[in-house]
Amino acid sequence: MLKKDFHHSASSANAFIDSPAYWIITKLYGFEGPPNNRMIMGTAAEHGAYEGLSKSLDDKHIIKETKKKYIDEGGDPDQKELEMAEQISIKFKEALAEFGEVVNYQKETITTPEKFGLKYPIRCITDFEFNDVIVDTKATAYLKRLKKGTLDPNWYPKKSDVRQQMLYARVNNKPTMLLYTSAADQEAIDMVDRGEEPLNEIISAFRSIEHITSIAKTKEDVVRMFPLNFDNFRWGKTEDEPSRVFARKIWQDAWK
């Protein structure tokens, strides 16, 4: 059922944990939604930051690189995400410069299945790697803080982000950090003393994916194993979201 060249990934496992139905439509049925300005904002911001770091660009040229990337990726230039991406890219660059020279950017690592007792390898792509640490950049519209100024622990760090970074730390044998950044705010969070649970959760998701797809005879069998609900940000906010329309038909057809 899974393609021969299938690779696990942190994003795939997190989707499976948070919303099995969304994992099903994207990984088994190949659904791809339209460009999302908020996601493109993050892609453009980190690209601009990397260009700024690697080429020693000033703010003006970082903004230029960020805008070009945003538009090239399909972002709507008339939406607020473009301006936020430009501002975030500068804040990314300023913070990341403190870690020294970038050793690798968007490095791909593919593990052997045996490393974690799996049937399929894991594909990991890290953002900014330095000599002593790997930093994963997270662009956001705003950071939710408590009245005393600290980040709201109910929101940060996000469990899915921690699972991803604990996996990357193990695969690369190097400490990892998260850098949450909005146009007006920023916070770095390390992965020290997180324990083994986040890593165990993501490996467990990989194993569940392999088990379910091995015992099911068809994709429709997998669909019938899980109820369809839209209680996750991946499904958007409106009833006519393309992903919701696509999923409804899949579930209806599976139960005919």
Which residues make up each language-model segment?
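Flexible, glycine- and charge-enriched loops at secondary-structure boundaries
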Residues: 38, 154-158, 192-195, 199
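Metal-dependent nuclease catalytic regions and adjoining charged, substrate-binding loops involved
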Residues: 170-256
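Hydrophobic/aromatic-lined pockets within catalytic cores
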Residues: 29, 50-57, 139-142, 170-173, ...
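Metal-dependent nuclease catalytic cores that hydrolyze phosphodiester bonds in DNA/RNA
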Residues: 1-126, 256
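Non-catalytic protein-protein interaction segments used by genome-maintenance enzymes to assemble
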Residues: 110-164
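Short glycine/proline-enriched coil/turn segments at helix->beta-strand junctions
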Residues: 101, 130-133, 171-175
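Short catalytic/ligand-binding loop motif for oxyanion handling, primarily in non-cytosolic enzymes
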Residues: 33, 142-146, 185-188
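Short amphipathic alpha-helical face segments that pack within enzyme cores
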Residues: 44, 163-171
